[in-house]
Amino acid sequence: MLQTKNFDMDNYIRIYEDVLDKQMCENIIHKFETSPHQHESFSEHFANVSFVQIDLGKHTEWEKEVKHIHNLLLKSVAQYANDCNIKKNIWPLDFTYESVRVKRYLPNNQDQFGLHVDVTNLTNAKRFLSFFIYLDDNEEGQTIFPYFENSPIMDEFVSPCKRGNILIFPPMWPWAHAGAKPIRRPKYIVGGYLHYK
């Protein structure tokens, strides 16, 4: 009979606090809300997906924010690699970024991003790391990893929506995750991926 063993392994999910300051978070939200001509709406009811986003790479007026995000991301990713004990011969020597997006989820009992993974085909298989930066405090709308435990009494790992925090994790199938519905106020995040080059 085939026997199985469970191994304790790092989940490679990390949260770093206060990487983006309050003023920059508020500025990005304000710019998002005053740029409705740049909004792209996404809605797939069968997949529990509904949100509005701006793809910052499509609009030159966001260059300053993108540069700032990339700079802080470099520091956070270096900390992540160190904290996860990722050796240099394992980490990509050179990488690039997928276009950064700002997403808004309204407290309308509809906006959310259902359970999914970020690498699903050959085209997006160049992604090797995912990140979200939370732009506002929100007691709901957290990011949920249902297959990772973070305490003896829970069967999932939950990243709360706390302004300025960055969540970093691998984008492949073991890291299936969901963005829960916000309840009382909109949820804003900056999201993107690191790519193999």
Predicted regions and their residues:
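Fe(II)/2-oxoglutarate oxygenase catalytic core
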Residues: 1-166, 172-197
